[in-house]
Amino acid sequence: MKTIMIIENNQTYHNIYKTMLKDNDYKFIHTYDGYEAMERMDETTPDLIILDMLMDMITGDTFFMYLRNIPEYANIPVIIISSAPERLYNHLRITDPNLAFIEKRSLDEETLIREIDKKLSFQESTRRIVSRLPEAPAPDTKSASVVDNSNN
């Protein structure tokens, strides 16, 4: 069973996500801001994160940048669900295939579960491909030559 971390400061939305995830056999971890999420990630690394952007303490933007700069967390899929317009976050999606966006006003269970399944499937496919790649050979430092350009 996959674990999803919900980072949302609104209790009503927490309850909505909880119902949607339980109905589709996902485990979930509730957090109410980016700071609490950072602390909880030390205990449990989720398979996917649902992230609100407009929060107190540590905002969604700050948490997202933190997440992408920690190697162990950098490839965790994130679904931003925000009341802010999607166009504000297009620059992030262009460079991050593990990111999706859903506007809160158009949120429904089918859309959320489809995005979750799509991101988790992409993550699993990527893992399988990477696991089949041969390891890069270590550089051969003995045969490397040093060029002396002091006479030029």
Task: Describe the predicted segments one by one.
Residues T44-I50:
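Active-site beta3 strand of CheY-like receiver
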Residues S121-N152:
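CheY-like receiver
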Residues T62, A84-K118:
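Alpha4 helix (beta4-alpha4-beta5 surface) of REC/receiver domains from two-component response regulators
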Residues E8:
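Conserved acidic carboxylate
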Residues D56-M57, E86:
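The feature encodes the CheY-like receiver
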Residues H30-E39, G60:
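Helix N-cap/capping motif at the beta->alpha junctions
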Residues E39, D61-A74:
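Short amphipathic alpha-helix used as the core "switch/output" element in two-component signaling
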Residues Q11-I29:
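Two-component/phosphorelay signaling modules centered on CheY-like receiver
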